[in-house]
Design a protein with these regions (language model features):
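Short beta-strand->loop structural element characteristic of the AMP-binding/adenylate-forming
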Residues: 1, 58-61, 88-89, 110-117, ...
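Gly/Ser/Thr-rich phosphate-binding loop
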Residues: 107, 129-137, 146-188
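Conserved S/T- and glycine-rich ATP-binding loop of Class I adenylate-forming
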Residues: 44, 50-53, 86, 92, ...
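Conserved AMP-binding/adenylation subdomain of ANL enzymes
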Residues: 68-85, 93-133, 148
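Short hydrophobic/charged patches on amphipathic alpha-helices used for structural packing
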Residues: 36, 121-124, 173
Length: 188
């Protein structure tokens, strides 16, 4: 990993040198129309794996239109701009990471800071050092963060909104009291 000077300091660049060279050498013209002629709004663009609550996880098809629509809706909802930095600590095969985070950030022209896995110990450090402004949470993430010892720096951050599902009203209220006026978009 090597540092990449992002909008608020260094952000880990997970690409290796060979990949960097491939990207630099890639053609800049539009992808040939003949290669995309059969792609429609309904054509699957990615597979999202279910949680496996009724058996083994299953691959669910996600269309181009649905992915693009996710970004359109959430861009307006969270008022995303190119100045935002989205924080993604979820695996990219997870629906929230593959849709809400990526499509919204790309639609807005915003950056995405990736972490290999969620860390309660590193969360606020990452938010502060990388200028994170928008975060996608799931389930108990906010409760895990609330269970960390209070710090005088709890309100010293640029996180302006979080979007996700599974936040209880009690944790939601305690979250705002402790970490300040972070706008929460709870939904499914």
């Amino acid at each position: 990993e090597k540092p990449y000077p992002g909008p608020a300091g260094d952000i880990a660049d997970i690409a290796d040198t060979a990949f960097d060279a491939e990207v630099a050498a890639a053609p800049r013209e539009a992808f040939p129309r003949s290669h995309r002629a059969a792609i429609t709004a309904e054509t699957p663009t990615l597979l999202i794996f279910t949680s496996g609550t009724t058996g083994l996880p299953k691959a669910a098809r996600y269309s181009h239109m649905r992915w693009l629509s996710s970004g359109d809706v959430m861009e307006v909802t969270v008022e995303a701009t190119p100045d935002d930095v989205f924080y993604c600590f979820l695996p990219l095969y997870h629906g929230a990471a593959a849709t809400s985070v990526t499509s919204t950030a790309l639609r807005a022209g915003a950056a995405i800071a990736l972490r290999r896995k969620f860390s309660t110990r590193e969360f606020w450090k990452d938010v502060r050092s990388h200028g994170i402004t928008v975060c996608q949470y799931i389930g108990e993430i906010c409760r895990y963060l609330m269970n960390q010892p209070a710090s005088p720096d709890d309100r010293q951050h640029g996180l302006r909104c979080m979007m996700g599902a599974g936040l209880t009203p009690e944790i939601w209220q305690r979250w705002i009291e402790r970490f300040g006026s972070v706008q929460i978009f709870e939904g499914w």
